[in-house]
């Protein structure tokens, strides 16, 4: 009986990935992050280190949707970088609310850019979408409408973002139990 070759063959056209200059344990781009912790536990500092240190200069664009982007002084270093990235009056990168239409346009534009880059045999640019502190906006996580196929653009981001060279970071505050809750 003839033995079949069971090795895996990698075909041309495999997904493009870009290594993080810091190496392990930082994943290659595109990637995604999900972090949930109580308030005051350093989530914003982790976010700033991811965007401004570990992946510094690797994103052609970074969009952030965060109610406190203009209020929280911790975000100043990120705001400074985003303001230098492009003219905010023509191409805003900072939003205080998540608008499914804006997210959809970002994803659709990036898909078109990636398609054109692949036709021209060019490397597609990596971009990043940051979603922070949106838990109190009830429609954000519950929405099932807005995406191209009838689903949420957040679902499109989570399921197909990597194919469009989109990395994404979702940060949320975890509710801390009150003392009476923990006493049982």
Give, region by region, the residue ranges found by the protein language model.
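Short, conserved catalytic or adaptor-binding loops enriched in Gly and charged residues
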Residues: 81-87, 182-184
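Conserved P-loop NTPase motor cores
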Residues: 33-53, 67-69, 96-184
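Pre-Walker A (Motif I) flank of P-loop NTPase domains
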Residues: 27-33
